[in-house]
Amino acid sequence: MNNPLDTTLVDSAIRFAVDAHSGTERRGKGFPYIIHPLEAMEIVATITNDPEMLAAAVLHDTVEDTDVTTEDIRKTFGERVARLVVSDTSDSTLGWRERRRGVMDRLARSAWEDKVVAIGDKLSNLRAVYRDYKQGGESFWSRFHAPNGKEDYEWYYRELGWALIDLSETEAYREYMDLLEKTFGKEISAPHQIDIREYEESGAGYNAVSYNYRYGKTMVKMYREGVDRAVPEQELRQSRNVRSLGLNTPLAGRLVWDGKRYGAEFVRVEGKRSFARAISQNPEDLTLYAERFAYLCKELHNTPCSQNDFESEVDFYHRIINQNTDYSASEKQRLHEFVNQVPVEYTCIHGDLHIGNILTANGKDFWIDLGDFRWGNHWFDLGMLYFVCKCWAEEPVFELFHISKVQMAQVWDVFARIYFSTDAPGTLSEIERKVRPFAALKLLHLKTLGLHYPEGDGMIRKELLGEL
């Protein structure tokens, strides 16, 4: 039999908070102020049943907004409750931004329990903001004291989201981030300045380097110098859109800048490694990961994709062909014709499909590097995978995927059998014949980006232009 929960401390804290806030009204709401602390406590209760944390949640505004002192809380409820209450209290003598900046800086470095108490308060506030904004529209923001109205509140609530990042696995945090998007939209604000010395490199690709933050649960993908901020902005926006489709991907955060490079910030996936890294560390598991990748790709390619949030792969390749300067007008026309004859599909494609762009951790898999995510025919995606598995040279394969070209070819062989549900040699050979022009098309894309490969032009001319 379970022992009954001792609610003595929480009951006492509720009565204390009711008395402290007696006669006060939640500003502009028309109901007693105590409703807010009670809601904050209810939110905290979705994360923990620790009585002292629940007590601190319902008491969080007593020191800041009433005559109650920290010493009163300490004498009545103990040292830990008093400390938790003070951790969620701001300095009323400071200006609007300075006061809130102090709260966020403190929260970012606080213990987990401080953040749990804080999210009860902040989520309750954001719920109220969202409800009132829906009713009042843009005129709602004029009711507040922030010098710059909505701009200040957007800054504040977005920054709070990252100060509370340690709670990213909780339902309360997910609700907070969802309301943040509904209230302020998906737009990326000014880049957040980071000190790259506070980060540890965790991986590198052909145009970006990934880092883990040493003092928190974030990771950043920093693009090479000279890459416009629009590229990481696109990746952040695409990542949010992909997540809304129900596909698993790390939670997207802020646009960042280290003084030389722009980057995209994400919630770090603890214990992560890519399928490529997993194979390099445990070569005996190659078949397991290649099969798993095939099933994940089948799921991806069967997911209906929003034509409003993502670009068509056909439109994308028409643009790439037009941008290329290495081919004549008649050759470009033949390339356009190839793209046009591909049957139309309205499902998701990754755009940069390979075993380095899927992470695994604690039994979960996460799609990453989603800047090229689009909708269209799955053969476009398979062309990229075939190229890196079967066509690329040994050196770039090992540099990016940490396995040999022979192993990479084995990945395709296993993948194709599972993805197409066949072991028939003739059918598999026909699949390779069909996918090679799409691999050549991906080479055309890479060539347009300034990434030249010895096998590139010859493959494009053979597979797409019919030259021997």
Where are these regions (language model features)?
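Active-site activation/catalytic loop segments of kinase-like enzymes and analogous catalytic loops
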Residues: L382-D423, F438-E455
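Short pocket-lining segment of the protein kinase catalytic domain that shapes the ATP-binding cleft
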Residues: A264-K272
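An alpha-helical support segment within catalytic cores of ATP-dependent transferases
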Residues: I188-H192, N302-G351, I355, A361
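Conserved kinase catalytic-core helix
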Residues: K272-E311, K332, F338, V342
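ATP-binding glycine-rich loop module of kinase domains
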Residues: G205-E233
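Active-site acidic catalytic loop and adjacent metal/ATP-binding pocket
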Residues: A208-Y215, H336-F380
